[in-house]
Each structure stands twice: as structure tokens, then as C-alpha cells.
Amino acid sequence: MMKQKIKMLIELLKEQEPDVDYSNIIEFLCKYKKGDFIYPMAIQRTCKIDSSNTFKILELCKKVKLVNTKFVLRCPICNCLGDKYYSSYYAMPKYSNCIHCGKENILHYFEVIYEVV
């Protein structure tokens, strides 16, 4: 199933930019299994691509049902991520306390990540 989704992703990528070599991105994505989280910054760092292209690729991954979008709160004080993942922005609490430093965290500080399905 995963190989079929990767194959569909490659086709979509080639439609958009036929002359680009996507092998490093495909290799990166193949390391993940169902339930793993993919962080956009990890793709940028590992594959050496900018954030705009990273999110374009991740949106194509969503299109072929390779990943789902998740939201997680990030503490503005200690910069740590929370331990709860939300399926939408509106599902997140408006206020919560950081599990690491205890400071109040408001909804403005969050990160978009992707869960492999």
C-alpha cells in the first residue's frame, strides 16, 4: 500500500516538475512507517529544499493519502512541543500549560506536522 502511494506521489511530482530529481525526497519519505510523524523542518534540512516546496510536497502527500495534517502546541518559553496532537486548528485548546516548564501556552504557538497513514 505504501509503495503504491509513493508511486502515485512520484507521478504527481513529475507532472509538476518533470526535470527535477526527487529521489532524495522519496528516499527520505520511505524511512517512515504508519503512525510516524514527519516534521517539515526535517524534510527541509535533510533534502535541502525551501519551506515553500516542502509544503507543496507534503500537500501532494496528503492528496495521495500518504499523510494527514496534525497540529501540536509549541511552548513560546522553552520551545518544547506538547504531547497531544490535534486533527485541526479548531480542535486545539485556546490555553494550556506547557508539560515541560508549566508556563501558559496560548493557541498562537503551534506547529503543523504530518502523520503517516
Language-model segments: residues:
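Residues at alpha-helix boundaries and short interhelical turns
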Residues: K33, K48-S51, K65
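Generic detection of long, well-ordered alpha-helical segments
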Residues: E15, D19, C47-S51
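Positively charged, polyanion-binding regions of nucleic-acid-associated proteins
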Residues: P18-F37
